[in-house]
Amino acid sequence: MTENIRQIAFYGKGGIGKSTTSQNTLAAMAEMGQRIMIVGCDPKADSTRLMLHSKAQTTVLHLAAERGAVEDLELEEVMLTGFRGVKCVESGGPEPGVGCAGRGIITAINFLEENGAYQDLDFVSYDVLGDVVCGGFAMPIREGKAQEIYIVTSGEMMAMYAANNIARGILKYAHSGGVRLGGLICNSRKVDREAELIENLAERLNTQMIHFVPRDNIVQHAELRRMTVNEYAPDSNQSQEYRALAKKIINNTKLTIPTPMEMDELEALLIEYGILDDDTKHADIIGKPAEASAK
């Protein structure tokens, strides 16, 4: 059923622009004739909003809770069709502080598989929260669903820290589940030497920076209208960037087992590029009373 489908996943730190980047890229892939389904695996349920021009799609778990069981749902109730025929599903999650979102993800995926949602597709894309690759959010990797992982990051310290953590999670399941890292997507924050830094990080993680997405306010303008840039401004420079990334993913054959860094290695890299200051830079104030350093 899923033998010829490429099952990819976008992971990344919360707030990095993962859902925005993935939807814009998948919209460009759909423009190129690829048949795509998005499965949102983020409790915020915002993985399909730009495709559907909606606030948030009703989730599999929410409807299942209303009906009593996931078996009582019809596929058409949870799978909607968006921009360029992209199929859209949100797995949803439990109320904050209650239960495991990962269990909801696998429940939703199993329901989709059992009801024929994976037929006539070229790509299935999982959009996954990724500050921490806990057992729950690692579910698409752990269960062998997502085979090809793209990490959305930037030149900021916490985004790189999360990328390294996600690489560690991929490594854990690379041999048992066959999952591979497809590359880093740098969603620019206009950090100094950002492209060079992420290229260096990619090399250390045994992968590639598959694309550098420049920062452009047109992305926010499109988001306010609940649209992808490709639909809102198809001739813009930014839409061309997403099309370039889409082509690279479609043609990507560099799928690797990552080599995550130790924390001191990552910090040394950040110091080298001036993201994290060396203590010597502030030697005149470190360890002094507050009133002395304020003078």
Curated annotation (Swiss-Prot):
Q: Which Pfam families match?
A: Fer4_NifH
In this chain, where does the modification ADP-ribosylarginine occur? R103
Swiss-Prot/TrEMBL GO biological process terms: nitrogen fixation
Xref: CDD domains: NifH
Q: Which Gene3D superfamilies match?
A: P-loop containing nucleotide triphosphate hydrolases
So what does this one do?
The key enzymatic reactions in nitrogen fixation are catalyzed by the nitrogenase complex, which has 2 components: the iron protein and the molybdenum-iron protein.
Q: Which family does it belong to?
A: Belongs to the NifH/BchL/ChlL family.
| Protein name from the UniProt record | Nitrogenase iron protein 1
- The scientific name of the source species is Mastigocladus laminosus (Fischerella sp.)
